[in-house]
UniProtKB/Swiss-Prot annotation:
One of several proteins that assist in the late maturation steps of the functional core of the 30S ribosomal subunit. Associates with free 30S ribosomal subunits (but not with 30S subunits that are part of 70S ribosomes or polysomes). Required for efficient processing of 16S rRNA. May interact with the 5'-terminal helix region of 16S rRNA. GO terms for biological process: maturation of SSU-rRNA. It comes from the Bacteria. PROSITE patterns: RBFA. This is Ribosome-binding factor A.
């Protein structure tokens, strides 16, 4: 299976931004952030970076605001690594998939505990 160029660029962006965040940005709004995924458009002009953060809703919003305000610096650092004619614009978005997955797990557990073990009688 062939990989699109945008997939390779997304992988490079993912590792580079993870490295930048591990070194730390000088913004107190940014909490403990984990990059969960990167989507790059086929024309390589926009990169959506999905992240999660430990904390409440206020921590999520402040981290997203901090990351988006640091996007210009991060884009500059990406330009050094990517060595492309045009470095993609960056947009940080909170990744709700973990919360969604947790909700599904909770519902499955709830259904499982609602079962009183009388399955053998129904057969």
């Amino acid at each position: 299976m062939k990989h699109k160029r945008s997939d390779k660029v997304a992988e490079t962006i993912h590792t580079t931004i993870s490295t930048i965040l591990s070194r730390g940005l000088n913004d107190p709004r940014i909490g403990f952030v984990t990059i969960t995924g990167v989507e790059v458009t086929d024309d390589l002009h926009l990169a959506r970076i999905f992240f999660t953060v430990i904390g409440d809703e206020a921590a999520k919003k402040s981290s997203e605001a901090g990351l988006n305000s640091a996007a210009r610096f991060i884009r500059h650092e990406l330009g050094k690594v990517l060595k492309m004619r045009y470095t993609p614009d960056i947009l940080f978005k909170y990744d709700h998939s973990q919360e969604y997955g947790q909700r599904i797990d909770d519902l499955l557990r709830e259904v499982g505990t609602g079962n009183d073990g009388n399955d053998s009688e129904d057969r």
